[in-house]
Amino acid sequence: MIKCSGCGACSVICPKNCIAMKVNEDGFYRPKKNADECIDCNLCDEVCPQIHADGTNLDDITMYSAFAIEKRIRTESSSGGIAWLLAERAVELGYGICGVTYNYKEKRAEHKNFFELDGMRALKGSKYLQSICEPAFQDVLKELQFNCNRRFIIFGTPCQIAGINHVLIKKELRKRVALVDIFCHGTPSYLLWQKYWKWLDLDKGMKEGKKMILTFRDKTYSWHKYFMHITSTSKNEWGGVKEYLAERSEEHTSELQ
């Protein structure tokens, strides 16, 4: 499907597990169907948010803007820290949390499920990559189906949330799940991400296999002039705003000469 956004809803709903999300030639996760296993139930089309777009008229709803009062939370978050506060409160109320972490070994973003605050710090901050959400979403469905008291809050991109919303409605589980989608301007290709890491390895000494601390939107120096910051256990560091400004200064100077 040309308009496919890679939300994974078709893979999650498939009763035969014959739809898998695979990286295509352009570096994006897209569904790949095993036609031999398909039973033509059409559930994949029924939950597809590209086929069934449920638009919201913003003039008909009340909207609020907010941010975390505690500066530490805002600093550690990509924006105002509201997602973290929602997750904290949800845990207190007994909800399971489904959000995005970064897998340093595989160098990709992945949805993970949590049921307590321990480990949830991995959810903090945006991951500007297409996340692998299907396994976590399927686990959410299993939890909801086998435990009538289980509730969840799911965080994701608009297409992922639209897709899982259709799945939950189809499964009659929607009432026990809170959905939170984030602003999204599109995700880069994993081919580009792989090339970037190769450059970091060769040019900046960020060797494969070493533990990294990756912040996609570091606000150490400024909220608006943010940058990506990467630190490894070998003390190599990349992304400091001083390095960036120095490079920009050199470029500007050379242009004037």
Pin down the residues of each PLM region.
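Iron-sulfur-associated redox domains of electron-transfer enzymes in respiratory
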Residues: 53-254
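Short, charged amphipathic alpha-helical surface segments
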Residues: 36-37
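Short secondary-structure boundary micro-motifs
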Residues: 3-4, 73
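Conserved SAM-binding loop
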Residues: 6, 40, 153-154
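Iron-sulfur cluster-binding cysteine motifs and their immediate structural context
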Residues: 3, 9-32, 42-59
